[in-house]
Amino acid sequence: MNNVISSKDNHNHTLVFTGKGGKYFVICLVNFLLTCITLGIYAPWAMVKCRRYIYTNMTLNDQPFAYKATGGALFVSMLLVFIIYGISLSLIEHGHPGLGFTLFGLLIAIIPFMAVKGLQYQAMMTSLNGVSFGFQCSMRRAWWCMFALPALLMVALYIVLYVISLITTAIGGLVFNIVFLGLLAIIGMGVINGITYSKWMTLFGNGANFGIHRFSIQVNVKTCIRGCVLAMLTLFPFAVVIGYLIAPVFTDMIFLSMTGNAQAGESVILQYYGQIMASYFLYFLAIIVVTSYLYVTLRNLFLNNLSLANDSIRFHSSVTSHGMLWRLLVVFVISGVTLGLAYPWLKMWLVGWLAQNTQVQGDLDSLELTNDEKPLENGPLMWISRGIMPYFPFI
């Protein structure tokens, strides 16, 4: 029995992160100085250096990851996007609003396509044991999941809230309507996030590959919706308290405006200064609480349902909401107090904790290490998209 347990344990590999805060601080300091000196031009190279340091100090089964992206590729991409954006603004300002808004609208509409190409580039530039990752998916499906579906759901939510507001206006008072509609809006946003993120997980999980081996995932949409709704509901008590604290300020400001004494607004702000600052504090605390719960929920749901090479390799995430919450609080508070000087050490501490709670289950030694022979695309869309680094809150 001991031999069996030992064998299973040998097939459970935890990510190991060996990055040091001191070295990362030097990288961040040099990046900051060079970015300031070059008026932001060095920013793409700075991002690559930071990401490369993290990747090369992350190991799986004693093998480090590698990151081969270049600052030049990212710079060209960002420059092209900036040029297109600048041309659209110039057309709008110089009497051609139709052309300007059309160009700007096209730029917004192709963001999902750019995100896919950006993911392809970032995946191809990331490797383990000399084998590169990859990503392929249908452009039509990507546009639907990343752009059309969220937009349609937002429109549907607005229509539902508008219709309900017409009904409740004749039934309840102003306070009841605000609280009730606010609660419905929070729940609706949770449902939209749940549906959208479940589609993103499926798109990303089933489109990724490691060499010749493909990843696969099956996500329960109801579980994703439930997690997102619960995450959004944590906003409600904060919103109630903030509303209670800030309501007298707006009441007095409206009263002064109606009596023609709007100049006395500064005295009202000074009178309620403590409540205003408390509201700001609760607002940022609410953001951190929601971010922690949502990130952990989505990350665990994604990794715990992800597999590689026909389910021979599986993944597991054991991060907790309370663990993420207090770490994010420490990162924000200490970084703010030290004016960002402590951030590199805190960043390494947080990444190390995430690595310790990420396991790969399976016999990695028996996995065939063969690269996918498909070359990286080199078309215009790829050139303009290499600097796009989509953020997914479940990775």
Model-derived regions, located:
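Intrinsically disordered cytosolic tails
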Residues: N2, M232, A247-P248, V268, ...
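Membrane-helix interface segments in multi-pass membrane proteins
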Residues: G86-L107, L157-M189, A239-T291, K347, ...
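Short hydrophobic membrane-inserting alpha-helices and related fusion/pore-forming segments
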Residues: L33-Y42, A170-I171, V333-A342
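Loop-to-transmembrane boundary segments
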Residues: G21, T70-I83, Q136-A156, I217-F238, ...
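Juxtamembrane inter-helical linkers in multi-pass membrane proteins
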Residues: Y55-P64, K68, Q122-M139, T202-C224, ...
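Membrane-proximal intrinsically disordered regions of secretory-pathway and membrane-system proteins
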Residues: N10-H11, V16, Y24, V76, ...
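Transmembrane-helix bundle segments that line or gate the permeation/cavity pathway
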Residues: N2-Y24, C28-L161, M189-M201
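Hydrophobic alpha-helical transmembrane segments of membrane proteins
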Residues: I111-Q120, L149-P150, A185, M189, ...
